[in-house]
UniProtKB/Swiss-Prot annotation:
The gene coding this protein: adk
GO terms under biological process: AMP salvage
Protein name: Adenylate kinase
Species this chain originates from: Leptospira biflexa serovar Patoc (strain Patoc 1 / ATCC 23582 / Paris)
Cited function: Catalyzes the reversible transfer of the terminal phosphate group between ATP and AMP. Plays an important role in cellular energy homeostasis and in adenine nucleotide metabolism.
Enzyme Commission numbers on file: 2.7.4.3
UniProt cross-references to InterPro entries, sorted A to Z: Adenyl_kin_sub, Adenylat/UMP-CMP_kin, Adenylat_kinase_CS, P-loop_NTPase
Length: 186
């Protein structure tokens, strides 16, 4: 059983690595964006609430996101573990997640943080933007995303370091090397 969080800045390879690890352990990869869209599509109470904000182009408030995460964690496929990808993004969300897990009699096993230098992230994201034809992902936008990550999400590293479950992973190297490092650490 593996209950994991994958963290790291945009372009670090969280989604790619989470995809590989979820197959190995046969556990769901839970992406905040995906479950928000699914909750809206399924017309759940939290989904209806989230839709109001999404339709207005606003950020969905923590209370709604946390409610949707809680609803997702009680589903049967999470009984043997899960990977949270893109959540939590703030210390407040991490504290709320701890409360949810306590309430559900669950504990996190590891928080995997993929560490990649900003210059490499910019290079990767610009390459991905060109490959996927995303003209809105220019260098300035990317640097803004990294700045937001560094100010809002980076404090989570200290939060999880204090719990003893943080696994710092060098995000440079081949996909296989990074996967093997993650597997050894969790």
């Amino acid at each position: 059983m593996k209950r994991l969080i994958f963290m790291g800045p945009p372009g670090a390879g969280k989604g790619t690595q989470a995809d590989i690890i979820k197959e190995k352990y046969n556990i769901p990869q839970i992406s905040t964006g995906d479950i928000l869209r699914a909750a809206v599509k399924n017309g759940t109470a939290m989904g209806i609430e989230a839709k109001k904000y999404m339709d207005a182009g606003d950020l969905v408030p923590d209370a709604v996101v946390i409610g949707i995460i809680r609803d997702r964690l009680v589903e049967a496929d999470c009984a043997n573990g899960f990977i949270l990808d893109g959540f939590p993004r703030t210390v407040e969300q991490a504290k709320a997640l701890s409360e949810i897990l306590k309430e559900l009699h669950m504990e996190l096993d590891s928080v995997v943080n993929l560490d990649v230098p900003d210059e490499e992230l910019v290079k990767r994201l610009l390459g991905r933007a060109i490959k996927e034809g995303r003209s809105d992902d220019n260098e300035e936008t990317i640097k803004n995303r990294l700045h937001t990550y560094n100010t809002k999400t980076l404090p989570l590293i200290d939060f999880y370091k204090a719990t003893g479950i943080l696994r710092q992973i060098n995000g440079l190297g081949s996909m296989e090397e990074i996967t093997n490092t993650i597997l050894k650490s969790i």
